[in-house]
Amino acid sequence: MHNAVQNLQAITEWAESQSDDAVRVTSATLEAMVHILSGTSESVEQANHAIATARSLQFQPNIRESIPQVWALLDFVDLACSLVESNSNEAKSKLAVMQKLLDELWETAAWPEGGTLYIPLGQNHDRKLTDSTNGIFEREGNGNDKLSLQWLSKRDLYAVGYAISAIATLLRGSNDSKAHEYLIEGLKLIKADFKASSLDKPGINPSSTSLASATARFAWRQRMEWNLRLQLGFVYCCQLRWDAASRTVEQLKSGLVKLESCNSDDLQRWIKYLEATIAQGTGDLDKALAIYQTPLLKLPDLAPNRLPTVQHDLAILAALNQLLIIFPHSHHQHFRASALLASLEPLALHHHHKAIVSAIWFIKTLVDDEASATIMGRKQVLQHALLAARSMSNQQLLVQCMALMNNLFFRNIVGDQASKSLRTGWVLAKRNEGRSSQGDSESSGGGLWTAVAGSMYADLLERQSALKEAEQLREDTDAIVDQLPEKVKALFIEE
């Protein structure tokens, strides 16, 4: 990575000295992408510096029209910086910019059918190279030379755009239906490419494509379909569509056979975590715990000055979910909770993703911990969880933090503060979870947290002698509970 960055920086400096703006934008954009892929603690800062270099040239004459694919890649990388830092507000605005550009490119940009990326070269380019490089440099009809690179077709780029749009949308909360829509559209694009009727379409398989290039493009589309389907599986979990999520697991398993060139452990790790999520969401806590404790999801060591990898993040999430299962004193593995929490804290408390920070503080409120041994200490710990959730506008985490706060501090209290807090928790849960089940006939129980918040609020209304309101709220809560998976329903009623 270090050598790649040095080479790209040298190209950028050389291009600046030659007033070769297209090359300069391209090399700065690629440098930003390499920084993000490097995973160092300074990667986002360094990527932003390279992005600023590229954007400083966006108003140069003809520069946007000459390299449309590069500007699209720059928007992708720019959005990725905000995703890495879990900055949901930045991500929202950058997502709008990216989508606007993609729509413009789809309608207007001159885009070679094979996805070839052409970088126009400045007048100081050694024109003899074009005659001796066998197609690496090409000459246009107007006599200008250009560098040709193999890249994504317009359809493939749009599929990537749908995938990134879904990730950015989920950053603010898991119940936004737009994420589901983006993934479905992305899958439609990719799946259409595999149909026999599509094989002779120029935008899918250009006639000039070599066998090696066509094979590589086909393999890329298979991996892209797998990744889109994986994201969709987690969206189904967020929507409480457990049957759809389970079907997705089977599709992912069968799809592994087609992905021979990919790291099997990496893909199996995702499948295992999705299976555990489904088991936990449907109340099969023993099965979920067993999967979370598999070697594939074991917490690995983290090298100094490195951001956590996907492997680290999945292991952290698996450990967090283990704690949610074993924290009750009655659980036969409760004795592991304190040690597991202690091993998690160095990885999670200062994680770059605020959702993980919020989750670890949330769990510290539950688990026997020195920081939350007193009422004041517990309030402070929960406040950290709330602040992290608010910083990224994550509605799902806010709902859960509010429910825990109300349960701990207002459960048997009558007063204005308790009334306001319990009602706020109920309204927030209802609004958040209502979005996940609108128009969803397959959902097996939208509104678990609405039921939790509604049940607590109904208790308060009864203590305030607002019996008619309490009765109506009980009926609404019972209707939600009736839709829950049987094992979840049993746990809810037991509590």
Regions flagged by a language model, labelled:
Residues 1-495:
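Extended alpha-helical scaffold regions
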